[in-house]
């Protein structure tokens, strides 16, 4: 079986291969730091060997719970924010039919999401669409007190209990939370919800291969065994024992850090496959939260191509030369669509007649790569044989491993996120939360 692979040839120009390979010692030292567990944030390294440590019994428990929800529910709402939401959304959007909710012969519940915003209209419309439907809830929160998911759960829990009664509701609610502590753990134990544990040593943005991601992905009918198998294979391929020249996570980390040192402050993750949009959203959180601190860090952005060539394409081609691209390039499609011949040929496209649409897309990808490289945009390519659970598992672990290496190379702790507390402190003060009286008085004086 093929694996995803990395090609940095088109990134060389701003930096040379020699410059990238000059980072070998540092990159391998950072991998060793990860594996030895003696670096910053070493209490959050549970993701490092997570794929290979998942047992068959754990997968079976998740699958059985998913089957219960699938048997009872036509809609399942996954409540979570950040890493408790984006990994699931990325996999489901990539592997389900693009128009899944319109299919008449669907075998799996519709997956909906809540708790990733505080939009009143969004919650109202979600509540309205759930009326009269058999629905369940997967509530994902380590503490149970994070504002966005806690609000959503309070509202949807009441709606579910009002609709089916507390006794039945408890069989349709699954809590994924801390093993012993927190408001959600307390509630789950009181109400008798089925629960899964968020490991203490796995941060949210690294949690997609824990029950946080695996349960809702299984509910959607996607093989979590294939997803985990892909991650296991990439765990082996990027191990500390794998030499730098063969270790794609190390080379990616070294290349992007060398580009950063040479003025490339923005990394754009691009794809030419519309189903990968939320892979990029997951990636942006992974790298943004991991590296953006201490006044440092590459800014992670993303584009969906060819769509965004008609909006951001101009900036990428001719704007400030502070960017580089990483392109996820998918080799094979799942379906075949041929361009038909049109007798009038008013659109002038008969020269494409008989070709697969993907051939047109591939030439757009190649032409774009050449244009951007000619325009001074270094281009890293991640080759993906096809969009499948196995290869997404590989992709997830590759980006996670490279993120840990890259953060250490940058000189930051890639496993904390102190900056996210600033807005929460202000929000609670403005909302007059008990215990924030002094902060409330101070912040209101500024308004």
From Swiss-Prot:
Q: What is its main location?
A: cytoplasm
Q: Which GO terms describe its biological process?
A: gluconeogenesis; glucose 6-phosphate metabolic process; glycolytic process
Q: Which UniProt keywords apply?
A: Cytoplasm, Gluconeogenesis, Glycolysis, Isomerase
The pathway entry for this protein reads as: Carbohydrate biosynthesis; gluconeogenesis; Carbohydrate degradation; glycolysis; D-glyceraldehyde 3-phosphate and glycerone phosphate from D-glucose: step 2/4
Q: Which reaction does it catalyse?
A: alpha-D-glucose 6-phosphate = beta-D-fructose 6-phosphate
Q: Which SUPFAM superfamilies match?
A: SIS domain
Question: Which positions are catalytic residues?
Answer: 289, 310, 424
Example of a GO cellular component annotation carried by this entry: cytosol
Q: Name one Pfam family in it.
A: PGI
PROSITE patterns (UniProt xref): P_GLUCOSE_ISOMERASE_1, P_GLUCOSE_ISOMERASE_2, P_GLUCOSE_ISOMERASE_3
Under InterPro entries, the record lists: G6P_Isomerase (IPR001672), Phosphoglucose_isomerase_CS (IPR018189), SIS_dom_sf (IPR046348), SIS_PGI_1 (IPR035476), SIS_PGI_2 (IPR035482)
Q: Give an example GO molecular function.
A: glucose-6-phosphate isomerase activity
Where is the protein situated, by its record's location annotation? Cytoplasm
Which EC numbers does the record give?
A: 5.3.1.9
- Stretch forming the signal peptide: none
> Which enzyme class?
isomerase
Annotated NCBIfam families: PRK14097.1
Q: What does this protein do?
A: Catalyzes the reversible isomerization of glucose-6-phosphate to fructose-6-phosphate.
Similarity remark? Belongs to the GPI family.
**PANTHER family cross-referenced by the UniProt entry:** GLUCOSE-6-PHOSPHATE ISOMERASE
Q: What is this protein called?
A: Glucose-6-phosphate isomerase
* Species: Parabacteroides distasonis (strain ATCC 8503 / DSM 20701 / CIP 104284 / JCM 5825 / NCTC 11152)
Source lineage? Bacteria, Pseudomonadati, Bacteroidota, Bacteroidia, Bacteroidales
